[in-house]
Amino acid sequence: MAAIHINHDVFNKYHTNGKLRLTTGYVQEAIENNGYPGHDGIVQVLKGKVEQGEQLGHAFTFRIRISDGVFQYNALMSADIDDQIKREVEHLVEGTIIALTKFEIYDQGEGAKNCFLIKGYKILSRYHQVLTSPEVKPRSHSGKPDEHKGYRPNIIIEDVWPEAEGMAADYQENMANPPAAKAPKREFGEEASYNRAAAPEATRARAVPPPARRTASNTERGVMPIAMVTPYVSNFKIHGMVSRKEEIRTFPAKNTKVFNFEITDSNGDTIRCTAFNEVAESLYTTITENLSYYLSGGSVKQANKKFNNTGHDYEITLRSDSIIEAGGELLAAPKLILKRVKLGEIAGYAGQLIDVLVVVEKMDPEATEFTSKAGKSLIKREMELIDESGALVRLTLWGDEATKALVDDYVQKVIAFKGVIPREFNGGFSLGTGSATRIISVPEIAGVSELYDWYANVKPTTEVKMMSQAAGGSNEAPRTIAGLQEMQFGKDSDKGDYATVKAMITRVNPTNALYRGCASEGCQKKLVGENGDYRCEKCNKNMNKFKWLYMMQFELSDETGQVYVTAFGDSAAKIVGKSAAELGELHDESPDEYNAIFERLQFVPKMWRLRCKMDSYNEEVRQKMTVYGVDDVNQDKYIENLKQMIEQMQQMSDY
């Protein structure tokens, strides 16, 4: 077998710090580009075999499977380079590292996945083990450009270059001991950037230069890790990349301007920095996200964890004498640290800042503008998130984030949300965003590939739980109405407690099941008649139209007692089987049919999810029950619950 000869030109073109580094993410980049992306890619051969043929007018002589360390993909060798393939066929085996210099995306016909048709390559090295990284599990690429759109991993997967051992040693020697009379060489920057298309200026701080090239300048001396910043360190100095920059906010009460940003060092530790008024205005125009800075001087205080999810115990308040200097390149790219909470567990973190890694199942096509209760104009946009827990959760984007979000950038993509807040409402849970929220599309962290695999292969057969609805009813043993009343269930919680009962509607008043509500978006105030029109006291305006809304009161009964409950909105619509608008139309046009609907609801056993809360009215404390869910009775499950209750009572009796 002929040896592989590497000359200085090839070495200089393809090495990174004297080693061979795979161009991670190159397969995705090429597929997005519909072919050769404008720069060569270093990949590894996983297998190869002779397979002559012709498809759709393209002749080929050899088939290989390649890996860029993150994605694996199939490729055909074009018959145009048949002579080269014959000379090197014994090298095109598992472990060989090659450079792709010319290729195109090849359509293999209906029902078959596309592949690369290689028309130019260079063998660089042989006899390597299959190169991978513990940070990501290699996966087969589907060939769909949108599946991982924009994914450009910074993962380093490299190996020594035995065929260029002498040149690599010379390179390392030159880098460690540069000639004193000469300025530092710039070739490395060109070589290191070879493996990837040139990054925009704003992201250059992410590059990973060789440590041997960095010398301790006056600027770098005295730099401490961000993790060591405390109020007890009087003269701190840190170096990191601005990983988040917020907009300046103005608080009208005192006309105070506030500017927040977060800085992350190469260890992955992050600290929040805050500036006020003139300092805020000055820094806002200076600080650029994704660039690195040296920062010294400022007051260190306890972090407010309600608004700060950096994980640091402290935060920095910058003063007029604080010094911020451009930081050049970091020794290592800052790591994204995600303190992940699965969606199925968010109920235990209500009101706290958490991080989630999810697939966006769907989102509103457009942002919605509405008026808040305080009369403020707001913009929001909702999306539904899912992860391996099988829980589906709604998340709301606000303001500019809601407006600029593109469906193609989110839907069916893995997204990391840092600093979102679980909120409880009506027994269900959703996620809210705020100024501390950071959104990272297809992050370069462990778990992304696994989540993609779960979404593609497991999720279609998974029973999804909607966390934004009242939770807990499906697995909780039912209670009795008398039991809830006697124990004053809900008295120990300001927000009330939730319980499930098996009961039936025994009395309902159709007359008061609906009311005419304000037609304004987001307002549900009951209208009052005024001069033939309607008036909303909340919005302080008259209108000639309204919307029907549910406020349905009825009696529930089981074998132990009766109680009056109230159902609103979606819960009432599920009970009746019609929207409020549909029922309102019958109310006006067909009163008999309208009344018949309520008659049919009575004396049908159902499983009711109730919120029980103690309420004060006219100096009298009473229990108020509201419906948050209703389902048909699963007889098998109900019988099993009854058996468990009997066993528990027998155990109590024996004791």
UniProtKB/Swiss-Prot annotation:
A Pfam family that this protein carries is Rep_fac-A_C
Q: Which GO terms describe its biological process?
A: DNA replication; double-strand break repair via homologous recombination; meiotic cell cycle; nucleotide-excision repair; positive regulation of nematode male tail tip morphogenesis; telomere maintenance via telomerase
DNA-binding region positions on the chain = 236-326
Q: Which InterPro entries match?
A: Euk_RPA1_DBD_C (IPR047192), NA-bd_OB-fold (IPR012340), Rep_factor-A_C (IPR013955), REPA_OB_2 (IPR031657), Rfa1 (IPR004591)
Instruction: Region Disordered: list its residue ranges.
Output: 195-217
Broad class of where this protein is predominantly found: nucleus
GO molecular function list: damaged DNA binding; enzyme binding; single-stranded DNA binding; single-stranded telomeric DNA binding; zinc ion binding
Q: Where are the zinc fingers (C4-type)?
A: 518-539
Q: Which CDD domains match?
A: RPA1_DBD_A, RPA1_DBD_B, RPA1_DBD_C
Name which cysteines form disulfide bonds: none
Q: Which residues cross the membrane?
A: none
Return the Low complexity bias intervals. 196-207
Stretches of the chain forming a coiled coil according to its record: none
Supply the alphabetized keyword list. Answer: DNA replication, DNA-binding, Metal-binding, Nucleus, Zinc, Zinc-finger
What PANTHER family does UniProt report for this protein, alphabetically? OS03G0429900 PROTEIN
As for family, the record states:
Belongs to the replication factor A protein 1 family.
Protein name per the record? Probable replication factor A 73 kDa subunit
- Species whose genome carries this gene: Caenorhabditis elegans
Q: What is the lineage of its organism?
A: Eukaryota, Metazoa, Ecdysozoa, Nematoda, Chromadorea
- What is the primary gene name for this protein? rpa-1
